């Protein structure tokens, strides 16, 4: 009898382990990056009290853990279960939308971003990603509206400014696009992606020397940018400067570009 009583006393903490205790343990595991353990504990808490009003947050936390573990489908399911309880949570909608985009489920992501914008019309993340989706669909008028909403709140927003430049290019407003591009470069003079983008625009507009100058600026900042050497080779080849083109292509090969990718271009350099 004494032994039974001792076992009963020792087991009290386990038996009395509450929903809140398990949730706290799960959160501690998240902080320690013990994600497998955190996932197990969140599931345990959800089974303990399936009707608890806090389960929306638990499903959301579970989804975030699963996202970090690379379990995208399970994370989407967890966020969906959370949204079944709290359908107007913009944070959960944004988290699920990002995963839908990752899975290339564009229409589902679009609907989530629309729902966020209905709730928070000035939400920058939703506006930017919806604009991106509109761009993919070639719905340029709608994309411009979203980018402009972002710029009304954040006039220096780089992503929105790039979006407007791309729209101007697609709609034939080349001077407007180039003016905006020049301003962007002046604001971000060491951003290689922006310099590379301007070089591409300059080349398309027949400004080969300006493009080559920008590519050289990129290579000063990032000497191992193989794509710049490929582009330099393409420009030189177009200019009939075969020796310079070959030199650029050979440098790209040294930096890891496959010979098969450049084989035809190298033939044209002979």
Task: Describe the predicted segments one by one.
Residues 19-20, 53-57, 90-91, 124-125, ...:
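Helix-start (N-cap) detector for alpha-helical repeat units in TPR-like alpha-solenoids
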Residues 31-32, 65-68, 102-103, 136-137, ...:
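Register position in tetratricopeptide repeats
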Residues 57-61, 95, 129, 163, ...:
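Canonical tetratricopeptide repeat
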Residues 48-51, 85, 119, 153, ...:
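Structural marker of alpha-solenoid helical repeat scaffolds
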């Amino acid at each position: 009898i004494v032994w039974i009583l001792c076992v009963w006393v020792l087991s009290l903490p386990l038996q009395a382990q509450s929903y809140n205790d398990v949730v706290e343990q799960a959160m501690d595991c998240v902080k320690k990056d013990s994600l497998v353990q955190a996932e197990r504990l969140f599931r345990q808490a959800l089974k303990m009290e399936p009707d608890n009003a806090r389960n929306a947050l638990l499903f959301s936390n579970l989804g975030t853990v699963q996202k970090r573990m690379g379990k995208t489908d399970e994370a989407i399911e967890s966020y969906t279960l959370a949204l079944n309880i709290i359908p107007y949570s913009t944070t959960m909608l944004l988290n699920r939308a990002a995963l839908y985009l990752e899975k290339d489920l564009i229409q589902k992501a679009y609907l989530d971003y629309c729902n966020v914008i209905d709730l928070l019309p000035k939400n920058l993340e939703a506006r930017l990603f919806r604009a991106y989706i509109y761009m993919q669909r070639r719905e340029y008028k709608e994309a411009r509206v979203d980018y402009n909403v972002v710029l009304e709140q954040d006039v220096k927003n780089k992503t929105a400014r790039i979006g407007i430049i791309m729209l101007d290019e697609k709609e034939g407003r080349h001077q407007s696009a180039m003016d905006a591009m020049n301003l962007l470069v002046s604001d971000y003079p060491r951003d290689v992606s922006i310099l590379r983008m301007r070089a591409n625009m300059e080349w398309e507009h027949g400004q080969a020397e300006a493009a080559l100058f920008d590519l050289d600026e990129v290579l000063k900042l990032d000497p191992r940018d193989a794509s710049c050497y490929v582009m330099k080779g393409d420009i030189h080849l177009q200019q009939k400067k075969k020796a310079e083109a070959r030199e650029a292509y050979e440098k790209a090969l040294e930096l890891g570009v496959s010979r098969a990718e450049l084989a035809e271009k190298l033939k044209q350099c002979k």
